[in-house]
Amino acid sequence: NINSLKEDCLINDNFIKLYKKFSPGPITYILNLKKNSKISEYVTNKKKNLAVRFSKHKIFRELLKKLDYPLAAPSANITTKLSSVDVSGVREEFGSKIKYILDGGKCIIGLESTIIDLVNKPAILRLGGLDILKIKKTLGFKIDININPKKNVAPGQSRLHYSPGIPLKMNVKKSKNDVAFILIKKRKIRLNNHYHLSANGNLDEAAKNLYSCLRKIK
């Protein structure tokens, strides 16, 4: 919660507005660390700021309540590989490298959290599960989108991050036989290898099913 956060990070008015509106939820805040912070340099990579998120998942929140310290919890994927949205994906990706898995079922949203830098002027560093229009409305001003693969200051800025390991193209209408097609909405088409992310084109449902679909294809 925000009280434990204050022990390690400096908070500001913009953070308070977003925290009250969207946390717990799919938003990650970049905040300045306090000089007396006890967060390990292995977590911060010796940087003076920290990425913080408040999970909404009931089981994970119960786990956090039993701890008297924050938990470093990166996404369940190897760098440049697909994110896992359920236990089967984690096992496929990591195999015997992980001894224990806390199974909370399939991810509710299915996409990474939206990352917003609040150290200076608010800026989006990674698009994700929270609509930036909602963030803009809450703050009351325009937000910069600073997604620069060359700087790579946040997860997801690399062009290969979360990639399926096979070529991926957008808006393809015709192709060879060894190609799979992913459709947002279910429709009657004459294609053998096609998958749909939502029965009626619901974007929230499509987002939830995207990574699972890519994992099936690869």
PLM regions: where:
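Active-site-adjacent structural elements in enzyme catalytic cores
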Residues: 1-218
